[in-house]
Amino acid sequence: LDPILVTRHLHYSLPYRALFARMMRRDTVDRLIDALVVLLVRLHLVGFFWGDCSLSNTLFRRDAGAFAAYLVDAETGELQPKLSSGQRSHDLANAEINIAGELMDLQAGRLLDDSVDAIATAEKVVERYDSLWTELTSWEAFDVNDRWRIARRVERLNDLGFDVAELDIVTDIGGRTVRLQPKVVDPGHHSRRLLRLTGIDAQENQARRMLNDLDAYSAATDQQGEDEEIVAYHWVTDAYEPVLRVVPKELRGKLTGPEIYHEVLEHRWYLSEQ
């Protein structure tokens, strides 16, 4: 029998060229680059060498004002126990070259704002990757009496959307200095928490926004001392679901439920500023 490959359609996703159907502004380009950097870091953390990182080989989904990126073309990829710094650098070099070429192609088609420097934007990939990779994997040394810095490091990673499942903590021979390094880092901190509390499957930034709204709902309804799961249930029934119910049926398939709710929160904020 001939082999076949069965693929799964990624709903609500778009190739980057569809996002550039109209003139694209600098801030939107930056958000695309940020999403691609997060994807590349996540792949490298699990030992996946992409081999051909580019905007063309990526799909994007809207994520509460940002984008979430997904690997599409993996025919050049290799899954290994751990990537060397040389392999990671090779992926980054390919990404920089490919993205610069893709942005220049968009400029030639007058689909990119003149203020966007294709070369400089592509170079930012390496800078942003190094910054995120360092935050997720680097050693940090501090005095043995400053153990509160362990919690602060974990909180910083949570803010970036990553859970820390394991830490490597070493104390020097003199017992005065502690060295800390995250060992097992999992993306999706906020989306996992939202799913646990509400059963709603959302992108990371959508989940972050909805959890903030859940906290605001808890304060507004004087439920801050109640069990978190109970408050979350009331928030879903009193806030989230009523918003989705009023969306016309013919428009419900345009965006995911969490993205619709984010748009409503944005609109509510703009109205409050007037």
Question: What residue spans do the PLM features occupy?
Answer:
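Fold-independent oxyanion-binding glycine-rich loops
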Residues: 10, 74-75, 138
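Conserved kinase catalytic-core helix
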Residues: 22-51, 55-56, 92, 96
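Short, well-ordered loop/turn elements at secondary-structure boundaries
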Residues: 37, 45, 65-66, 266
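Catalytic activation segment of kinase domains across protein kinase-like and atypical kinase folds
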Residues: 49, 55-105
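Regulatory N- and C-terminal appendages and interdomain linkers associated
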Residues: 105-274
